[in-house]
From Swiss-Prot:
Originating gene: P33
Organism lineage: Viruses, Viruses incertae sedis, Naldaviricetes, Lefavirales, Baculoviridae
Enzyme class: oxidoreductase
Cysteine pairs bridged by disulfides in the record: none
Protein name: FAD-linked sulfhydryl oxidase
Species of provenance: Autographa californica nuclear polyhedrosis virus (AcMNPV)
Role of this protein: Functional FAD-linked sulfhydryl oxidase that is required for infectious budded virion (BV) production and for the formation of enveloped occluded virion (ODV).
Family stated for the protein in its record: Belongs to the baculoviridae p33 family.
Length: 259
């Protein structure tokens, strides 16, 4: 269970806004393939949102919401689409899927990535409440979500950079898949508090004992966020500010009350 901290509450609301902006892309799509891809992702996001809010995926209602978004006029401005979205979610009894704020920034995207990372960690740590196969399937879907974040980035330079470095996140999701697969065939996962990949290549024990960092994806998303913030000064050809600070793992764990 993820502790309900102010930061995690912000992440959840950003996730709802991210989901809204994703279905906004549906009405502008002119490609059948893209529409199908966006619909699949939006359906997953809203199923999960409903699971959080209603303890049920609300399959029919989410399907109606997605179909409505697909058929909405591409000429409608975002403000009008927001008004009609509020009306539609109210009509479908999906009010809890309405974001508290519609102010969309880069923070919205970062919060959503951190949120999904925490969800992955929670699914892995509580895997005994479902099944390994179920968690493995969720991880495959999560990889697609992270892979396609560039769809919603409204900065060309940011999109290009994300396309180059997103493999860092996906690589770590696949490390979790490998650990789960080992457990499936008899080698239980041992959770440790430190990041293991630096020594995994040289330490046979790390590999053979199937060790996995607890809260790995939270750590990875924090590290990735720090890297992007570091690299933007190179992209802008500017000197970093004198008092520029990076998030530390200790501070991040405190903000999220992670054990």
């Amino acid at each position: 269970m993820i502790p309900l901290t102010p930061l995690f509450s912000r992440y959840k609301d950003s996730y709802l806004l991210y989901s809204f902006r994703l279905i906004d892309l549906l009405r502008a799509s002119k490609s059948t393939h893209l529409t199908k891809l966006l619909s699949s992702q939006a359906t997953y996001l809203y199923h999960f949102a409903c699971l959080m809010k209603y303890k049920d995926i609300q399959k029919y209602e989410v399907q109606q919401l997605i179909e409505w978004a697909i058929n909405a006029s591409p000429d409608m401005d975002l403000q009008q689409f927001r008004i009609e979205f509020m009306d539609k979610t109210t009509e479908l009894n999906l009010r809890s899927c309405q974001p508290k704020s519609f102010t969309y920034t880069f923070t919205t995207i970062w919060d959503t990535m951190h949120f999904l990372s925490l969800i992955i960690d929670d699914m892995v740590y509580t895997r005994d409440k479902s099944s390994l196969d179920f968690v493995m399937q969720q991880l495959k879907t999560m990889k697609v979500l992270f892979y396609n974040v560039f769809f919603i980035l409204q900065c060309a330079m940011c999109r290009d950079h994300y396309m180059n470095v997103k493999g860092f996140i996906i690589y770590h999701i696949e490390l979790i898949e490998i650990a789960l697969d080992k457990e499936k065939y008899g080698t239980d996962i041992t959770f440790v508090d430190s990041y293991q990949q630096e020594t995994a290549g040289a330490d046979v024990a790390v590999v053979s004992n199937n060790m996995l960092m607890k809260n790995l994806m939270a750590y990875v998303s924090m590290t990735f966020h720090n890297h992007i913030n570091d690299y933007k000064w190179i992209q802008r050809n500017k000197k970093p500010p004198a008092h520029y600070e990076r998030m530390t793992w200790g501070e991040y764990k405190k903000l999220l009350n992670l054990q």
